[in-house]
Amino acid sequence: MKCVKKGLLVMIMFVLSANSFGQNKKQNKKTPGQAAFYSNTYPNIFLEAGYKQKDIDEKLARAYHDIFEGPNRVYFEVGDSMGYVSDVKNHDARTEGLSYGMMIAVQLNKKDVFDRIWRWSKKYLQHQDGPREAYFAWSINPQTMKKNSEGSASDGELYFVTDLLFASNRWGNNTGINYYGEARRILDAMWKKDGTGNIYNLFNTEHKQISFVPEGDGYKWTDPSYHLPAFLEVWALYAKDGHEQFYKDCADTSRVFLHRACHPVTGLNADYSDFSGAPHPTRWMPVGFRFDSWRVPMNIAMDYNWFGKDKSWQQEYAKRFQNFLRSKGINTFEDQFNLDGSRPDVILQAGGFKKLRHSLGLVSTAACTSLINKEKNSLDFVHALWNAKLEPYEDGYFDPYYDGLLYLFSLMQLSGKYQIIKQQAH
């Protein structure tokens, strides 16, 4: 009898221990340590919203086709080995779109597209000597090959470096391009820029924040949509240039900066900000939430998903932002605002059109915040994106470049296809 009781006691203890282990596992899934970097799991919000995997895959493939291969594509191949992404409506190619194209290519494992864009960008936009050495001219006319500016926009280099680090991790450095070497060239040159020729580090080293431009007065303020703490975590992991702690500090600073830059009620941010987070007025446009700002919710969702180091604030932000847009009509909210949510007096023009509209780009990035906001009605934004189309608006305006790229990025995020590409055996 004692043996039976002893056996029962052991079994009960085993069951309780197993239950406790199972509960701990469930709890661990909810901790910040279980962000995608740690779990290698990326949520598929479309699947959670009730869509079939086959339909999700088809929607993503169609979007890629439309933007990179279809009759309204913004990607164009040049000769046997190069290609570029063009902001067609503005008749230029810019580091923004080129680096976006490379990010999409490395995420979707399209090596030829990645290599073509990099070769074109390096040949026609990267400075090979002088104070700007290794930085990129931010805009060029792809028909005349005349640069619209010699200067850099810091987000272009931010994306280029991250693209190249991911490419190195995915494909290695012995397939024709030394991706890691190219990333290090940009970073090593960046750290040598001390103001000579009025050219600086991409990051204001005093404030540990990315600059609007690494030149002149533009080094002293910033653009909230350039704040991608997730990318800086990637740099800290894979750049291996001796500045890991600086990149970690910049990531943490960006998170705190976004707390200050986003309105406490609407969640809206200004296109440009001082390092304090206060709006920064410019000579070309008064303060407002406009095209650059559309990227902020997408960037915050990425950081939440990839590293999960600021979840509490990010969850509150997502609720505020979605609640504000919902108050304007989930199928009608416009695309430019004053930070308090009122209509702006000055409208920023796009492609010859100066009007407010319900823009696909903002519909897309707003849906990304459903990665963060777990309230059931948050899926309304996911359904709105699913039903949206990359096509001309009623007045004829059509932007497969900015609308299209943000649309594709958002489909990738919400389907779990926008990931940290870790080092792989080659």
Mark where each language-model region is.
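Hydrophobic h-region of N-terminal signal peptides that target proteins for export
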Residues: 12-20
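Core register positions within helices of long alpha-helical scaffolds
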Residues: 104, 163, 167-170, 186, ...
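C-terminal functional modules
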Residues: 342-426
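N-terminal carbohydrate-binding/catalytic regions of secreted carbohydrate-active enzymes
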Residues: 37-157, 163, 293, 362-372, ...
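Extended ligand-binding clefts on enzyme/binding-domain cores
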Residues: 27-62, 91-95, 130-135, 149-155, ...
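Bacterial N-terminal signal peptides that target proteins for export
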Residues: 1-8
